[in-house]
């Protein structure tokens, strides 16, 4: 591999992140507007979870664009190659933003899973108090905060990272990323624990959410107090949350497995180096579309906005006029 070919994907990644940033923010802000203005009363409590997830995903999109990092594993170190606007503020800011990026990504996954847990508890108990809702949301920030804080308790030696990276990847042209950052010792307690939290989150969150989703659907089917329409809308929402939970599995597990393979064998996987950062935040770009489709009031609002949904006010007027001729008292009963 020549030094030139090692950066052949970079122009495409640059274009992607521009589309990702402006498109992602637009869709998330549209979703936030729908949550605030089109949520029916039945979604009043659920709205807190939706707003929380939307807010976190806006931050994640911003951090992904701010860093635009490429991940380059070494034998005993890990290089983070930023190409985003963070470079204007120096290596320390880029490395700090990278930690926040990982922490917020974990918090997004926990937030979506937390929404499913809330639906499960609401169906079982009938009502969840407002204080319990805020407690549930607050608890999801604990693992994420630990993931963010841990690296700041360890020493940073970017010069050593750069030296080791150039030695282990002599054919790579890394000048476009200078001065890049990273972990100089991946065997440290801080790096190991933070990585463990992220791995547990990637595997445990979908597993637990999948189980709870099946339980939620079972409870909805057994609920005799719900109308058929409410049951269908509730199940549709549950399916949407399940999609949001399992989307990260598709994005995370393949690239994470390739990263472990590259770390253990020292085999350079150029595409995976870029995809590791891209796919961690990619679900935040897609999630609004899942919400637009699976949350029925939002879908109806968008269809109404683009005039794709057939409205029935004319039919209602005709029916009322027809009935009024036969029985005027139906129209004016007072």
Curated annotation (Swiss-Prot):
It is a multi-pass membrane protein. Keywords: Membrane, Transmembrane, Transmembrane helix. It is found in: Membrane. GO terms for cellular component: membrane. Its main location: membrane. The chain crosses the membrane at residues 15-35, 46-66, 98-118, 133-153, 191-211, 241-261, 276-296. Belongs to the nematode receptor-like protein srd family. This is Serpentine receptor class delta-55. It comes from Caenorhabditis elegans.
């Amino acid at each position: 591999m020549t030094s030139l070919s090692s950066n052949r994907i970079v122009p495409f990644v640059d274009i992607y992140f521009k589309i990702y940033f402006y498109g992602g923010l637009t869709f998330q802000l549209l979703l936030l507007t729908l949550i605030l203005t089109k949520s029916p009363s039945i979604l009043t409590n659920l709205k807190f979870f939706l707003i929380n997830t939307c807010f976190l995903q806006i931050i994640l999109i911003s951090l992904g664009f701010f860093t635009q990092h490429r991940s380059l594993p070494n034998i005993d170190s890990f290089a983070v190659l930023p190409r985003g606007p963070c470079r204007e503020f120096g290596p320390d800011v880029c490395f700090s933003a990278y930690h926040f990026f990982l922490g917020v990504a974990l918090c997004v996954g926990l937030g979506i899973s937390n929404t499913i847990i809330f639906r499960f508890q609401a169906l079982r108990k009938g009502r969840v108090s407002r204080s319990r809702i805020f407690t549930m949301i607050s608890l999801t920030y604990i693992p994420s905060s630990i993931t963010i804080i841990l690296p700041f308790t360890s020493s940073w030696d970017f010069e050593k990272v750069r030296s080791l990276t150039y030695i282990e990847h002599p054919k790579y042209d890394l000048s476009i990323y200078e001065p890049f950052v990273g972990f100089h010792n991946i065997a440290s307690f801080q790096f190991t624990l933070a990585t463990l939290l992220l791995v547990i989150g990637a595997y445990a969150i979908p597993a637990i959410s999948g189980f709870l989703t099946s339980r939620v659907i079972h409870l909805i089917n057994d609920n005799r107090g719900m109308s058929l329409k409410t049951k269908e809308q509730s199940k549709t929402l549950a399916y949407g949350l399940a999609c949001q939970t399992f989307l990260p599995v598709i994005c995370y597990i393949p690239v994470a497995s390739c990263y472990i393979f590259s770390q253990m064998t020292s085999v350079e996987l150029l595409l995976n180096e870029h995809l590791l950062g891209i796919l961690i935040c990619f679900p935040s770009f897609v999630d609004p579309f899942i919400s637009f489709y699976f949350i029925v009031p939002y879908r109806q609002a968008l269809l109404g906005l683009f005039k794709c949904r057939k409205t029935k006010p004319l039919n209602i007027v005709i029916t009322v006029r027809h009935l009024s001729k036969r029985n005027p008292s139906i129209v004016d009963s007072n």
